[in-house]
Amino acid sequence: LAKRAGLLRRDSVHGSFQGTLRVDEENECIIANGNVIRVIYAEGPDKIDYTTYGINNAIVIDNTGAWSDEEGLSQHLKSKGAARVILTAPGKGNIKNIVAGINHRDIEQDDTVLAAASCTTNAIVPVLKAVNDRYQIVNGHMETVHAYTNDQNLIDNFHKKNRRGRGAPLNMVITETGASSAVTKLLPELDGKLTGNAIRVPTPNVSLVILNLTLNEATTEDELKEFLRTSALYGKLQRQIDFTTSPDIVSSDLVGNRHACIVDGEAIIVKDNRVVLYVWYDNEFGYSCQVVRVVQKMAGIAYPLIPENAQDMGF
């Protein structure tokens, strides 16, 4: 328990915890800024009685990586007090993949198992939707420059995927991404129009997607910048899209950003109807904020957007 609290107290990427932390060994709790976090140990996801801890109708957030299909994730629902499950990864089979701001209204009361898609999908879909709604995308390619993850090896070792076996802190690793196919499930109007690939790089957090798009109509750099800036400030996706024109911004500056993505206005390239967008995202904290937004929707919690009359805006 003390080790878990220590990992929360000091984070190599996100820095020191802002507040107080206390460990209650007797009650198996970590108390963070007065909030009691109960640590529950069990032999399996179906072996917990949440009601013993005063928890009823719980939404279980599964970030174990152990299951991604409905059968595996439904094990949580066998535990007393658990009502619904959300996976922090792409769901397989018939599981609905929900991206806050895009298709959160597809959540129904009888949906017991949902997925929050991937961090990359959450980053690119809001920008693609905004651009497609305004300009109509003819085709495009997305290249993800992704921070390394603990799926990779620290030093060269065996891995089921050849290149990912090489040391993550030492190499740029070309790999694949399922984000392009995931996009078309969320935005069917882009089906067959996008390709995608990925490069894992030796940085611990904050990733970048380069969107190379052909639009149905020509635009200018100034016009596209203003459109994306306005979308970030006042649009339906203002919680998902951020926009920066800082000339010296780099990846580490965006650690802790709460948006699903940040459009780099200074890096936009436009030539007639061909555009290149550089879209940053904190693949840890920014994605976690998106997951929280989905959980809030599942729980029936909603916070207003500004302006107040924006009833149709995203969640």
Where are these predicted regions, by residue range?
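N-terminal Rossmann-like NAD(P) cofactor-binding subdomain of oxidoreductases
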Residues: L1-L154, F158-G165, I269, R293-V294, ...
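C-terminal substrate-binding/catalytic lobe of Rossmann-fold NAD(P)-dependent oxidoreductases
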Residues: L1-Y50, Q136-N139, T144-V275
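Acidic active-site catalytic centers that drive phospho-/nucleotidyl reactions
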Residues: D62, I210, D282
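A generic structural signal for alpha-helix starts
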Residues: N122, A218-T219, G286
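A broad, structural surface signal
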Residues: K129, D133, S181, D222, ...
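NAD(P)-dependent Rossmann-like dehydrogenase/reductase catalytic/cofactor-binding core
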Residues: V255-F315
